[in-house]
């Protein structure tokens, strides 16, 4: 009888342990699915922004559009050659938004000193029928590069617009500067 009770307790313990293991695995699976859903949502949002950025640039006759949510570079044919531009380190500050405009030359030559114009603001409407609102601009200047291929990081402070409000950054009129 003692043996039967012991076997019964052992069998009950095994069922309890297997139920705990299954609950742990279920919790782990739910966490994995939740993480995957968040990542898919983020990828979908980035895909929409990349598509919007590509459409804006296809329609643009002057300059290149960069959308903060796209997290992907865009190319600009300029007077100093083909440039690859992107926005990095986008953060809020007391006066608006700070970010870095990364400009990369695509040739094997160093970039000359250059200037250009940066416009930024909000986009209202659809990509096919949009309006830029609250547009502000600032001039940028970059020194000549010594190395090739060249990367130039230009810190920008975009006053009066929060990270959430920032709909676009457009760079245009890139011209060499004589030193």
Curated annotation (Swiss-Prot):
Positions of N-palmitoyl cysteine lipidation: 20
Location (main, coarse): membrane
ATP-binding keyword on record: no
Subcellular location(s) of the protein: Cell membrane
One term under GO cellular component: plasma membrane
Bilayer topology term: Lipid-anchor
Official protein name in the record: Uncharacterized lipoprotein YajI
Organism of provenance: Escherichia coli (strain K12)
Upper lineage: Bacteria, Pseudomonadati, Pseudomonadota, Gammaproteobacteria, Enterobacterales
